[in-house]
Amino acid sequence: MANKVTLTATDGSTVEFYDEIKAQGGVKDVYFSVDKTYVVAFYRKAINANDKARINDIVNIHRNRIFTSDAVGQYWTAFFAWPTKIVEWKGLTGIVIPFYDKKFFFDGIDPSWPFIKNGQEKNGKWFSSAKLINKFVPVNQKGTFLSRLHMCLKIARAMRRLHAAGLAHSDLSYNNVLVDPLSGNACIIDCDGLVVPHKFPPEVVGTPGFIAPEVLATKALKVDNPKKNLPQISTDRHALAVLIYTFLLNRHPLDGGKVWDIDDPQKDDDMRYGSKALFIEHPTDKTNRVKADQLAKSQLPQGDPTKQPYTICGPYLKKLFDRAFIDGLHNPSVRPSAAEWEEALVKTCDLVQPCQNSGCEAQWYVFDNTTKPRCPFCGKEYTGQLPILNFYYAPSHGKFISENYRLMVYDLSLIHISEPTRPY
């Protein structure tokens, strides 16, 4: 039995945990509290005064501003695994983080399943690529297209709140979000590394595949070089767009068939995601189109954009994907904000309709504005009536202007219920 350790946090409260490492990250060792309501993560190496000051700001100043004691502040606690206390032990600094909600751990998996096991964290990576989700994730853990829309909505909403506080995550990726496609929930983790602009620079440049092209293009420059691009809110916006695209379509928007350097894989990756980054579904430049004949069976059909193009996500998301991966890929100032993604995802949720094929994995799809919509995932044509409400506003008496907002109404619609998909 491991020994119990009792410490006094910097805020004067008592922290108790067992002296046994339960998990290890890139820079921290994790211990479980005695009552298993929180974990204590200690930095493996002593941190400098600047890092201590940054963590103190995150734990105290920014936490108190976001997670206020009223209903609004409490609402946000489900969106972040935010550090709540700071402790010192054996010369090392540690942070106290609430234990992840049980919905972010796999449950209900058949013991004979050879890959994922019950109790494992639902790391976002499992649900990001066709190969992983098709080969390793059991059908009863995949969720539906609608629940994945809800999941992306939660991520966008969390990032909107973070950016509104003037903070940037700096390493937003599928590795730093926990997701639950079954309930449509998500939680941002690793919040101790947040960037406080103009005060605390980023610790890392990000995760490969999610690093903004302008950051990757100058990664070789020293930190004090004025030409070096560092993670900030605009680079978070790139990572958010990539994350939403991968969760909904199970492929990476920049992973096409073009090889930029045949001799050096690292240089090829740096060009693919950096200076030469090109959207695989670019409407006019076909240089980086996916070569379907080179895809593994486990990558299909999602890996082939000709089978499931990004337009199946509906008009609102299509417009933002264009801005993120065409207009804003190398022009950060025009990238969609987290608030814009949130709004587009809410509108898209209001435009979905149920698939009439009981065997369809997706179960839902976005109305395609035709009289005979067909599920893009299984091909089932919809039969029956399709009531669509178009919203207008009246700037003056007798004049009506479209709000660019439509609502699909069907017999199982829950529009009369206060849903968590609506902006708070």
Predicted feature descriptions by range:
Residues 81-147:
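Conserved structural core of kinase catalytic domains
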Residues 244-318:
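Conserved C-lobe activation region of Hanks-type protein kinase-like domains
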Residues 236:
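Conserved catalytic-loop aspartate of Hanks-type protein kinases
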Residues 415-424:
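Single conserved hydrophobic/aromatic residue that forms the stacking wall/gate
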Residues 159, 163-181:
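Catalytic-loop of the protein kinase fold
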Residues 178-218:
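Activation segment/activation loop of eukaryotic-type protein kinase catalytic domains
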Residues 2-51, 75-79, 88-89:
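ATP-binding glycine-rich phosphate-binding loop
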